[in-house]
A protein has these predicted regions:
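A carboxyl-terminal module marker
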Residues: 1-4, 10-196
Length: 196
């Protein structure tokens, strides 16, 4: 049994990805999912599709409907779909409900934009953010992924928003800078260039 989501109009690939991540969070799948861009679905745009991987298992896929398919069905705008394999997801879900109070201290957000070799997956970048982000790392979100004429051949542009927060104090610039230095250093070691 599959659960299928669709959107068109104002949404984009990242909007659909956000919907999937929110769905997983609501059913107690709290580990970070990763995305493999080699979903191989012919009805999806070849450069805008990915398998959804959770806890090492492919649990679905998402992407932009191929323009030719959209034209065939009279869809005059970009359309996006996510298909989730419910038997796999039900095995992984905990359906737990936890109350979290309102955060007492403010968050600090840093955005990073990178030029990344095409063979490096966003999941590898996210592993670095998680490992090097330190105790104050609260969350991160991919907000831009671009391959095109303005980016040199063999590379893609990737951008993340990274959020830091302490539970017991207001973070100082030095706290955030130290974490960002570790993240950026590890990314540069992978051959990733930071965009200014």
């Amino acid at each position: 049994m599959q659960f299928t989501l669709g959107m068109y109009g104002e949404g984009d690939f990242f909007s659909m990805k956000g919907v999937v991540e929110e769905f997983f969070e609501k059913i107690g799948m709290h580990k970070k999912e990763t995305y493999d861009p080699n979903a191989g679905k012919t009805f999806l745009h070849p450069g805008r599709q990915a398998n959804i991987i959770y806890d090492g298992k492919v649990v679905g896929y998402l992407g932009e409907v191929h323009p030719e398919v959209a034209d065939t069905y009279g869809i005059g705008t970009r359309a996006y779909v996510a298909v989730i394999d419910m038997p796999e997801v039900v095995e992984l879900a905990t359906f737990d409900r936890k109350y979290e109070g309102i955060a007492k201290y403010p968050a600090v957000t840093r955005d990073i934009s990178m030029v990344v070799p095409k063979e490096i997956l966003v999941g590898q970048i996210e592993e670095v953010i998680e490992k090097k982000g330190g105790a104050y790392l609260e969350s991160y979100k991919l907000f831009d992924l671009y391959e095109g004429a303005q980016i040199k051949a063999g590379f893609k542009s990737v951008a993340y928003s990274i959020v830091f927060r302490a539970k017991d104090k207001t973070l100082e610039e030095a706290d955030v800078s130290a974490a960002m230095k570790k993240i950026l250093g590890a990314l540069e070691e992978m051959g990733i260039e930071l965009r200014q």
